[in-house]
UniProtKB/Swiss-Prot annotation:
Residues 1-65, 397-434, 463-543, 573-679 are annotated as: Disordered. Residues 488-507 have a biased composition (Basic residues). This is pH-response transcription factor pacC/RIM101. One of its GO terms (cellular component) is nucleus.
Length: 706
């Protein structure tokens, strides 16, 4: 019986053991390689305990029994905290190839990998390839691989100040901080103390004792004084918003902002203009193109001070808008309100990109010089623009007049004196200054304009503001400069010039003849030519300095003077004019001929005495019939010979007649080709262009000098 019961009892025991094994294996987690040593020790102790209890039992299933004995002593996880602790413990094992060393902390594990596996170049064991598990990442520097090892090690020393999240590498923290960009109004900054400027951010919040940003209420303690009375707000009975502390925002003056934007706009326009000059994007010899390009700079606040006397440095500081604080009812700062804050750091205008080097400045200065020569000295372009009138030296501009040629400032004559009758007082004729349109003692090559048109062109009042071209004050060698022009034109007889200059300076002691000598117009040496313009049509002849000023009055010149004039007669005439300044001369005006007595007429002094006596016998009064303003002395003598009876003609009379016909032809041509009256806006634009070019050149000069 016993032999039968034993197999029956052993069968249920063998069936219970696999069932227990399955029940215990279900909650059992997967075994790790790190626990092999503990499992072996537990297996040995279990076998020693089971061997005395079942000495007679044969083990038909030794593998199952061994497995059951091994599983029995392993403790099962009770809760999630134990599992987390187990995971942290497992992560502190070095998984470098060939190393299974366990470290107590993450810092120790990181130091272990860096020192033992990465090594150093100084110890000749530097390894730049990551051997953690199957990573195989290779770097070029030790710093790079040590930063890479932080990815494998659970060491997170970098914490976010906003949310407290920790990161392994500093670059990971920077990426995370960018996710808080939506919360940029909450910039962590300390509360401003007395005398300190507001934080860099537009808004400020408090900082807690633990170093993290505190979004709670922050008392206003930045400024010891209360808010201004006119901004004072009543005491709030209800608590303020606890989400923010003191808020800082800009309420800068709009005038400063507008001033900066205006200066910035002018600065950019000037920089663009200089860039066009460097790239030669327009023709500097075209008056229309230059005027159109300069028109873009008019009206803009260019960086020039007091007419470009001093150039403004490109790093010009401008005040920033002030920052103010708005308190939220702290009670310590005297209640809420607007608090004045100290100004922030100044900002500057950007540097000009087209004026970086000295070569740029010199090239632009040369280009501006070409433009200046075009505006000043191109007769054809200026005449086409309606600024220059043939034979006229002044252009009326509102209440002011500008001199457009190189002539003397003594030319501000009263044009109404041209219409003075012979019955006027003798002193009226002597006070008429010389101009190229009305002077009767200066031979001119400019087209003769009738007195009516001269009266319209010449101003009768207002002071003259000279716009002296650079060619008369500086060493410019342009094609229209006085040096080049005077060398290509003929010279005027100094006999006429000397006489007129002496009387003119005598009557006008306050004239500027010291700086500007009397500038006669150029004349053709041959008086018989019918066209005194050579290659210039419809444009103002340039008034230039004469290269020869001969003070000797005894020399004889051809053209306009009788050949029979001797040295003694000239000296007697000169002394007689000095003794009687009230001597009158022939007036020429329009188509009317004013006559003067032969004894008082200036024409009588330049005619041979024999011819003058014959003329007095034939006619009671003589007058000049010519309409010319210059060379009227010779014209008057020819008129006397024409109006009188037929006397024996001489060679001198024939020469005078030819000169008179030449002057009449020139006057007719000038009358036909005279342009209409100059529009005021054209003159204003020309003057603005002249002044702008002068300012720009002075600005470049200041930059070059620095």
């Amino acid at each position: 019986m016993s032999s039968r019961e034993n197999p029956d009892t052993s069968a249920p025991m063998a069936q219970q053991q696999p069932q227990q094994q399955q029940q215990q294996q279900q909650p059992q987690p997967q075994q790790q390689q790190q626990q092999q040593q503990q499992q072996q020790q537990a297996q040995q102790t279990t076998q020693q305990q089971q061997s005395p209890q079942q000495p007679s039992q044969q083990s038909p299933l030794p593998a199952a029994a061994a497995a059951a004995s091994v599983i029995a002593p392993v403790p099962l996880p009770q809760n999630g905290s134990n599992g987390a602790a187990l995971g942290v413990t497992e992560n502190l094992v070095c998984q470098w190839q060939g190393c299974q060393e366990r470290l107590p902390t993450a810092e120790a594990l990181y130091e272990h990998v860096c020192e033992r596996h990465v090594g150093r170049k100084s110890t000749n064991n530097l390894n730049l390839t990551c051997g953690w598990a199957n990573c195989r990442t290779t770097t070029v520097k030790r710093d790079h691989i040590t930063s890479h090892i932080r990815v494998h090690v659970p060491l997170k020393p970098h914490k976010c100040d906003f949310c407290g999240k920790a990161f392994k590498r500093p670059q990971d923290l920077k990426k995370h901080v960018k996710t808080h960009a939506d919360d940029s109004v909450l910039v962590r900054s300390p509360e401003p103390g007395p005398g300190t400027r507001p934080p860099n951010g537009m808004f400020g919040v408090g900082v807690g004792a633990d170093g993290k940003c505190s979004l709670g209420h922050v008392h206003g303690q930045g400024y010891p004084h209360g808010a201004p009375q006119y901004y004072q707000t009543p005491h709030q009975q209800h608590p303020s918003n606890p989400s923010y502390g003191n808020v800082y925002y800009a309420i800068g003056s709009d005038s400063h902002q507008a001033s900066y934007e205006s200066k910035k706009r002018g600065y950019d326009a000037l920089n663009e203009f200089f860039g066009d000059l460097k790239r030669r994007q327009f023709d500097p010899t075209s008056y229309a193109v230059v005027g159109q390009r300069l028109l873009n700079l008019h009206g803009l606040p260019l960086p020039l001070v007091n007419g470009a006397a001093v150039a403004v440095p490109e790093y010009q500081t401008q005040p920033m808008p002030a920052m103010v604080s708005v308190g939220h009812g702290g009670g310590h700062s005297g209640g809420g309100g607007y608090q004045p804050a100290s100004p922030m750091q100044s900002y500057h205008l950007p540097p000009m990109g087209n004026l970086r080097t000295k070569a740029d400045l010199m090239n632009i200065d040369q280009f501006l010089e070409q433009m200046q020569s075009t505006v000043y000295e191109s007769d054809d372009h200026v005449a086409a623009a309606g600024v220059a009138q043939p034979g006229a030296h002044y252009v009326q501009h509102g209440g002011m007049s500008y001199r457009t040629s190189h002539s003397s400032n003594n030319a501000n004559a009263n044009a109404n004196a041209s219409h003075t009758a012979t019955s006027s007082p003798p002193s009226a004729a002597t006070n008429i200054p010389s101009t190229h349109a009305t002077a009767t003692t200066t031979t001119t090559s400019a087209p003769m304009i009738p007195t009516s048109s001269a009266a319209r062109l010449l101003p009768t009042h207002a002071p003259r503001h000279a716009l002296t071209p650079p060619s008369s004050a500086q060493s410019y060698t342009s094609g229209r400069s006085p040096v080049s022009v005077s060398s290509t034109h003929h010279h005027i007889p100094p006999s006429h010039h000397y006489t007129h200059t002496h009387n003119h300076n005598h009557n006008h002691p306050n004239s500027s003849a010291g700086m500007y000598p009397t500038l006669p117009a150029t004349s053709a040496q041959d008086g018989s030519s019918t066209n005194t313009y050579h290659g210039v049509s419809g444009a103002a002849a340039p008034s230039t300095l004469s290269s020869v000023f001969d003070s000797e009055g005894g020399r004889r010149y051809a053209g306009g003077c009788c050949r029979g004039l001797d040295r003694g007669l000239w000296r007697r005439h000169h002394r007689r004019r000095q003794g009687s300044p009230s001597m009158s001369f022939a007036e020429v005006g329009g188509n009317d001929t004013k006559t003067a007595s032969p004894s008082m007429s200036f024409s009588a002094s330049v005619i041979d005495p024999a011819l003058q006596a014959g003329s007095e016998k034939q006619s009671g009064s003589s007058g000049s019939g010519g309409e010319a303003g210059a060379g009227a002395g010779a014209g008057a003598g020819a008129g006397e010979e024409r109006n009188g009876s037929s006397s024996s003609p001489t060679a001198d009379v024939e020469e005078v007649s030819r000169a008179l016909s030449s002057a009449n032809a020139t006057t007719t041509m000038a009358t036909k080709t005279a342009p209409p009256e100059v529009p005021s806006h054209t003159v204003e634009q020309w003057v603005a262009n002249v002044r702008l070019l002068e300012k720009l050149r002075l600005y470049i000069y200041e930059r070059l000098s620095r």
